[in-house]
Amino acid sequence: MGRFNVKFMIKDIEDEILCLRDNIRKWNKEYYVDSSPSVSDLTYDKALLRLQDLESKYPEYKTLDSPTLKFGSDLLNNFEEVTHSFPILSLDKAYDIKELLLWIEKMVLEGSSLGSYTGISVEPKIDGCSIVLYYKDGILQKALTRGDGRVGNDVTENVRTIKNVPLSIDEKVELVLRGEIYITKENFLKINHTLKNPYLNARNLASGILRRINSREVASFPLDIFVYDILYSSFGLSTNHDAFDKLKKFGFKINPFCKFFGGKNLEEITNHVKKIEMQRNSLEYEIDGVVLKVDSFILRDILGYTSHHPKWSVAYKFESCTGVSKIVDIVVQVGRSGKITPVAHVEKVFVAGAFITNASLHNQDYIDSIGLNVGDVVAISRRGDVIPAVELVVEKLSIGSFKISSNCPSCKMALIKEGSHLFCVNKHCPYRIIEQIKYFCSKKCMNIVGLSGKTIEFLFEMKFISSEIELYTFNFDRLINLRGFDLKRIDNLKRSISDSKGRPFRKLLLGMGIKELGANTILVLINNNLNSFDIISTLCKNKEAALAKLLKIKGIGEKIALNIIEAFNDKIILDKFNFFKELGFKLEEYNTNYVVDDSFLFGKKFCITGSFEGHSRDVLIEKITKKGAIFNRAVTKRLDFLLVGEKPGLKLQKANNLGIKTFGLFDIKDFVDLDN
């Protein structure tokens, strides 16, 4: 009996990990790509922490495509994508004073034990659009959005129009700064009132203005900025408060609520946090919390980074503001995977700076837990000040709880329950097909520009297309007399669809929407010579042999392997691939040396010794640090590795004495582009 219990426990753990990954990937897409998150920051962060904890305890289930190794993206098609010189990370979070105190105590303790504690800086967390400013010889060279943390959109010309961004500074220095572009509450309401399609909140308006193509238009809007961090400077700085003093002298705008606490009195720090929270509604701009940072740059260097956030900083998130509204309808949505999501439509209500008209209800269990139905008056919050959420029933005006139908709202097939969620398993379900076509056309897959979600729904409902493949056979000239389809738009659509034929095999494979098969897992397959449709489909004909081979590949778990095998025995998917093959699509990936995960270097402290044929040491240092590693000039016990070339010096002997790992160029070639 005991054996069975252990087996079931392990199976439950594996299922929980897979479920968490599914949810987090979905939430990442909703937040960073669709701009319509369905869960709160708190729910997201708890899920991410739970996944990190499980992967730490059960490393055998950790895969290279885990969302714990990645973070989201705000990249757009309209602006050039540029690689950041340094990783632009997120922040660790605390949701109550107790968590915040524990973090402060930890920083004080670690800093004091190392003799490098100088204090804590506290500043408001501005709810705006993140920007990175690059100065060379004292002149603004470029301004990039955060993007996915490694690559951002170049919005330099638009940022130049913001009056509080210095175009040049008095000293010929190099600087890389982080800031937050925002628009005041008053200006948000004034401008939003004049727009045909108003924005949900001030942050979205600021982001929308910043991404306008015409810089003259941007200049006509009152965007503003607070600078809050130095990522790099060509002059020496030892503390955050020294850095802020220097930035003020250069003419940068620093938030007036930024305050430095040099002592170890925790009460002083938390009182200032509470003061900012109390004054939140009276501020002229939106904030959603405060950020605490270790003041000493030396201590920051010692504490280091995770792949997600610096260990020397934390964001304390304020509780969301709430409003009261009435539920006028509950609709049920069907996702690409068949997952059923109930959504509440509510009477328009202004909550935390934005008008709310709908909110996700997650699943039937959630609805039952608060006893919700159409007609009820409910409390609505913007969790994390972003996501609309129904918190509770304030006034019960209906009978009982809303019940999701046992049949799919689209195809009417009986739903099945997996965990807390209902699913439609009909592969021919119209709603599922529409969502799959949207995914196929998305930037991350086939990048068919101009085919919006509404356009795809229109084409499907008019029976012009019934799957992805019909995008390539449909005569788009038939749309020319329809409203919204002029000749220019149709030509652009045809060109974009034609261009998609040249997308690499890995993008086409991703676009098939195979469950659990994400971009990184596809690169794992390719790196293990499963790099073409013919190779994978031939392998999967023998299911047992395919499973055995796939499970030998690091980063491929049983569930992913079974999903791949099932997909490559699915007539619908095989027919699609064969269609694309006949159309001349690339069904083979010729480059089989993709870097799947460069987090190996991220946050690692390294030093360098010796000479390297064909490579200058300065260039090597630059390339490695661009991957998130931290360069140290001397070998110390805190070093993670020493890069060793020909004729190494005494640094090698010291590293060996301290037990520090030593690497050659061969050891890092998979993580750093040494050829360019």
Swiss-Prot record:
Disulfide bonds: none annotated. This is DNA ligase. Signal peptide: none annotated. Its EC number is 6.5.1.2. Keywords: DNA damage, DNA repair, DNA replication, Ligase, Magnesium, Manganese, Metal-binding, NAD, Zinc. InterPro entries: BRCT_dom, BRCT_dom_sf, DNA_ligase, DNAligase_adenylation, DNAligase_N, NA-bd_OB-fold, NAD_DNA_ligase_OB, RuvA_2-like. It is an enzyme of class 6 (ligase). The gene is ligA. NAD(+) binds at D41, L42, T43, Y44, D45, S90, L91, E123, R146, E180, K293, K317. CDD domains: BRCT_DNA_ligase_like (cd17748), LIGANc (cd00114). SUPFAM superfamilies: BRCT domain, DNA ligase/mRNA capping enzyme, catalytic domain, Nucleic acid-binding proteins, RuvA domain 2-like. DNA ligase that catalyzes the formation of phosphodiester linkages between 5'-phosphoryl and 3'-hydroxyl groups in double-stranded DNA using NAD as a coenzyme and as the energy source for the reaction. It is essential for DNA replication and repair of damaged DNA. Belongs to the NAD-dependent DNA ligase family. LigA subfamily. Its cofactor is Mg(2+); Mn(2+). HAMAP family: DNA_ligase_A. It catalyses: NAD(+) + (deoxyribonucleotide)n-3'-hydroxyl + 5'-phospho-(deoxyribonucleotide)m = (deoxyribonucleotide)n+m + AMP + beta-nicotinamide D-nucleotide. The keyword NAD applies. It comes from Borrelia turicatae (strain 91E135). Zn(2+) binds at C408, C411, C424, C429.
